[in-house]
């Protein structure tokens, strides 16, 4: 048996060490490798010996469950080498606080080596030959994602590194574009987006009840991440060409994207 905790040892969920997906495949749950606002991430291994990451949703509220199901659906729909790869999903029976029997949702995905923030903390600024193909790949991946949804939560922690590939992950705050999939449960004036990385329209929406957050917001956020990679500093203030050390074309595209114009 394994005890799952969510930043609180007094709130635990005990599950069997083997979980079974909706397709009938079973996985052994190993060590914890991450923790978020509503869930925990563990390493897991299948019968063939392949190692993956499994995310357990430890919030039982309907709002959290709806967001989680939308996240899983988006992982299934959006396929690209620079988007986190879906493997399987399902539910597992758990004992909550040694008392109640509850159902815990989980999703299994490819396992990364680390996230971009951890990488930047332990490394100098990457060379052009390393970051340029990753920037291009992430932009292409975002274009694929935008066929279905808006991410709204792009930050270095949500960009994972697997081998030499940077992968966009964590679709928990995504807003679907199609009416049949769309169920935006974000309240008016609810903060959407991470500190340091919020777009002008996200700030306007949060503080002043402004317009909806659209695709341009994602472009703004991912280009702020690119600035972080290129400068090794958290973004803030007014940027100029002198602040960013890269090729003229990349510099021009980034500065255009992080302007305060909603339509750029």
Q: Which residues fall in each region the model found?
A:
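Juxta-kinase regulatory segment immediately upstream of eukaryotic protein kinase catalytic domains
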Residues: 1-22, 30
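Protein kinase glycine-rich loop
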Residues: 30-36, 41
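AlphaC helix of the eukaryotic protein kinase fold
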Residues: 62-77
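Conserved HxN/HPN-centered segment at the entrance to the catalytic loop
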Residues: 79-95
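Conserved short submotifs of the Hanks-type protein kinase catalytic core
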Residues: 98-115
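Activation segment signature within eukaryotic-like protein kinase domains
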Residues: 134-135
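Protein kinase catalytic-loop region centered on the HRD/HxD motif
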Residues: 138-149
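Conserved activation segment of eukaryotic-like protein kinases, specifically the C-terminal portion
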Residues: 186-205
């Amino acid at each position: 048996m394994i005890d799952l905790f969510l930043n609180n040892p007094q709130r635990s969920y005990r599950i069997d060490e083997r979980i079974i997906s909706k397709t009938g495949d079973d996985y052994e749950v190993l060590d914890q490798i991450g923790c978020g606002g509503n869930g925990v991430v563990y390493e897991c291994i299948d019968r063939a010996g392949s190692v993956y990451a499994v995310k357990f949703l430890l919030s039982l509220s309907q709002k959290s469950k709806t967001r989680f199901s939308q996240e899983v659906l988006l992982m299934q729909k959006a396929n690209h080498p620079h988007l986190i790869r879906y493997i399987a999903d399902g539910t597992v029976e758990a004992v909550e606080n040694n008392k109640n029997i509850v159902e815990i949702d989980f999703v299994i995905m490819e396992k990364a080596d680390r996230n971009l923030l951890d990488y930047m903390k332990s490394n100098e600024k990457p060379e052009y030959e390393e970051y340029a193909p990753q920037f291009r790949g992430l932009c292409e991946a975002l274009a694929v994602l935008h066929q279905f949804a808006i991410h709204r939560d792009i930050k270095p922690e949500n960009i994972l590194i697997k081998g030499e590939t940077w992968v966009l992950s964590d679709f928990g705050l995504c807003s679907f574009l199609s009416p049949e999939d769309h169920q935006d449960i974000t309240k008016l004036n609810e903060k959407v987006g991470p500190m340091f990385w919020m777009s002008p329209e996200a700030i306007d929406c949060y503080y002043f009840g402004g317009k909806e957050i659209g695709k341009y917001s994602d472009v703004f956020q991912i280009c702020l991440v690119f600035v972080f990679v290129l400068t090794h500093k958290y973004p803030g203030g007014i940027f100029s060409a002198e602040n960013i050390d890269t090729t003229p074309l990349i510099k021009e595209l980034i500065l255009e994207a992080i302007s305060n114009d909603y339509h750029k």
